[in-house]
Amino acid sequence: LFCPTICEDVAFGPRNMRLPETEVRSRVDKALETVGIGHLKNKSPFHLSIGQKKRAALATVLSMDAHILALDEPTSNLDPRGRRELIALLEAFPRTQIVATHDLDLVRHLCTRAVLLDAGRVVADTLPEALLDNHALLEAHGL
């Protein structure tokens, strides 16, 4: 988030795709409403909570109509309510998601496949339940 307002941040991608301004505005409004921060569109990102910033960042991706969503520790620094709300948003996202996380509960709720990496090497590639139920494997790799 680097623009003066959330609206401008969310519009950045579609504008750089050279979409018509009416389409840009439509995508921005839809993305902001989808993540529940339409009322913040004219606010500076520098004055938002962590949860609001995460929602704004997600809106920037949604406005691009991305087919794959890559997330790095999406629930970090969120309070319990913000975490639940973000997970609900991600569950509703109908596209492929690649999530890097240490939040094992997030894996259980959100993922259909789990890949465990250690020192850049794949040590497991399985269903989330199978991975999360293997306590010896998790402990051996620092989880």
Name each model-derived stretch.
Residues T101-H102:
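H-loop/switch region of ABC-family ATPase nucleotide-binding domains
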Residues R121-G142:
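Conserved beta-strand-loop-alpha-helix hinge in the C-terminal portion
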Residues L58, L86:
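Hydrophobic anchor residue at the start of the ABC signature
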Residues V107-H109:
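A short, surface-exposed alpha-helical micro-motif characterized by mixed small hydrophobic
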Residues T22-L40:
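Conserved ABC ATPase "signature" region
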Residues S44-L48, Q52:
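Conserved ABC ATPase signature
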Residues L69-D72:
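Catalytic Walker B motif of ABC-type/P-loop ATPase nucleotide-binding domains
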